[in-house]
Amino acid sequence: MTRRVAVTGIGVVAPGGIGVPAFWDLLSSGRTATRGITLFDPEGLRSRIAAECDFDPLAHGLDPELVERADRYIQFALVAADEAVTDSGIDFGTENPWRVAVSLGSAVGGTTRLEHDYVLVSERGQRWDVDHRAAEPELHRAFSPSTLAADVAERFGAQGPVQTVSTGCTSGLDAVGYAFHTIEEGRADVCIAGASDSPISPITMACFDAIKATSPNNDDPEHASRPFDAHRDGFVMGEGAAVLVLEELEHARARGAHVYCEIGGYATFGNAYHMTGLTSEGLEMARAIDVALDHARVDPTDIDYVNAHGSGTRQNDRHETAAVKKSLGAHAYDTPMSSIKSMVGHSLGAIGAIEVVACVLALARQVVPPTANYETPDPECDLDYVPRTARPRRLDHVLSVGSGFGGFQSAVLLTGPAGRKR
């Protein structure tokens, strides 16, 4: 018998919204969190704007010693995980630790700390024969992507399968998808799943500057991210984390947990085409959607909302529009599709998990978040992108899709309580 997978807890650290209530308030209002960069001096960069988190780790209960050693992205994940676990009401002291898993994603790991320590060991980049004596003993733990899952597992005593997923901008979706499979296939009863990234750092911003992927609209940052709009000119870098507590459905019911929704299907494919390029037909994303729907035994005409990758680059938004039309057929024109990146930016590996939490909340509130700043239609992007204002709507089946550098294409299907009764 197939094991069903429930979402019983959610937590989020996002630009403009630390914690679930503040996050949903931002999304439902259509406000944007993009401002000028304050985390470092961006002088000389083409894109000098970002969606930063107003984040004080000590104010959110993290231990000062941990804050000293842990990179910002680890801090985000721990705060989001604390919120999700508290929300779920689960008591890990009564759980079998071998049946508790962790699946977390990150695209760039602790680059902020790595850049900082490179300055220390190289005399601000002036030495190639680095002074190893200046390296901090916690550096490896601070920047290694494996630390993300390890630190969260240690915090909650999880001794089941523990993994960090790094598949570029689909890392968060894939971490949730792998968690779903881990429970569905019987390898765990509970999984702490999600993703975290803090990529607003000089080298990371410079990398995306170099390929002109980020918006140069420095004079009007609040309107810089405009997915699907004819005048879009790149994405806005963001940061943050989202964590979900996933449980085998009967396990959740047995302890009387509140069930937000179920994860019904997941799929991921590669395009074997180009590191950053996308095929114009959207075949690989369409394939991911098709397989996720088939996994969930949901018909394309049952989809009530698509949470788009919607990065705001010229090629992505065309590619994604084509993929959704290929998978949903004529129903695509009747299905609202929006991008929350217009409000919280693109936090690379973290955004997929943040978007899954947005989908959980959309199902819970029966409201579709808008695409902020969408004003001028693009003839090649001709679907309903929910411009500027959130929209009440019956939602039973919600699809979240993602696209990552390296050719990764992923999709997760979420089903609300009423969806199983259709």
From Swiss-Prot:
Enzyme's top EC category: transferase
PROSITE patterns noted in UniProt: KS3_1, KS3_2
Gene3D superfamilies for this protein: 3.40.47.10
Protein's UniProt name: Putative polyketide beta-ketoacyl synthase 1
Keyword Transmembrane helix set for record: no
Native source species: Streptomyces cyaneus (Streptomyces curacoi)
Catalytic residue positions: C169 (for beta-ketoacyl synthase activity), H309 (for beta-ketoacyl synthase activity), H346 (for beta-ketoacyl synthase activity)
Gene: curA
GO molecular function, one term: 3-oxoacyl-[acyl-carrier-protein] synthase activity
One GO term describing the cellular component: cytosol
Family matches, as InterPro entries: Beta-ketoacyl_synthase (IPR000794), Ketoacyl_synth_AS (IPR018201), Ketoacyl_synth_C (IPR014031), Ketoacyl_synth_N (IPR014030), PKS_Beta-ketoAc_synthase_dom (IPR020841), Thiolase-like (IPR016039)
Keywords: Acyltransferase, Antibiotic biosynthesis, Transferase
Catalytic activity, EC: 2.3.1.-
NCBIfam families in the cross-refs: PRK07314.1
Pathway: Antibiotic biosynthesis; curamycin biosynthesis
Family: Belongs to the thiolase-like superfamily. Beta-ketoacyl-ACP synthases family.
Domain Ketosynthase family 3 (KS3): 2-416
Claim: Ligase is one of the keywords in the record: no
SUPFAM superfamilies in the record: Thiolase-like
Any one GO BP annotation for this protein: fatty acid biosynthetic process
